Amino acid sequence: PWQSKEEQEMSEEIHSTLRFSNVSTSKKSGELAQKLKKDGAFASLLRARQSCIMPSLLKHKIGKNSKYSGVVKCSSKLDYVTNFILERKNNGKGKLVFCHFREEINQVVARLKAGGIEKVGIMDGRVTADMRKKVLTTKYDVLVLQIQTCCEGINLQDNYSEIYFISPHWNPSIEDQAIGRCHRIGQKKDVEVFRFVMSGQEFETDTEDDEAVTLETYINNRQNEKREIGKVLLDN
């Protein structure tokens, strides 16, 4: 759930630029929505994702004089996700946390360390080949990864058995490959997977019959459809 009304309203205005969201057309007149219309559909998709994860990812688009300028200090999702991980920090299971953005990775790492988890590693596009080898051979309590660069080609089954997706990926096979990093031969523990999706239930719609959805909910629904299609094709 959204912990800040301003954070919810900002995401709601951004989502109003996406037809599938069913957000009330009255939100399209906002200053931020107007900016996004000029930037095009792909920009709206990116900003909608960022608004669900961490508003500070939008700080350059929001501007200092915007009514949403204070929202950059909020992140309902990261508050929930990191608290959830911290509640499980003493269960003896290594954790893989998959993110999309570098700033998101930095924030997750900082929050986990502040919560008392000392051994937190990072693997993203900034990691060199030599550093990568060290990361892969070090046993961290939590390893935070950028999903697009670390979903394949690495074996992590020896140290990790919990997987967290902070935001869904458009391609379900990317997530399946990410899970495969530790759900493979040699894994001695049950692997648990946690996915986090922001809801649009609190967003305003034009009619009572409409149901507003966030980009994350939309992607999650498309993932399920793709998996069902794949299952039918394989069964036949």
Question: Which stretches of residues belong to each language-model region?
Answer:
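Cytochrome P450 catalytic domain signature, combining two hallmark sequence patches
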Residues: T17-S29
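RecA-like P-loop NTPase motor core
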Residues: P1-R19
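SF2 helicase motor core recognition
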Residues: I105-V109, M131-K133, L143-D190
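Conserved Helicase C-terminal RecA-like lobe
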Residues: P1-E7, K27-N155, D235-N236
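Residues at the starts of beta-strands that form the adenosine-phosphate
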Residues: G94, K119, E162, D190-E192
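A conserved SF2-helicase RecA2
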Residues: W170-N236
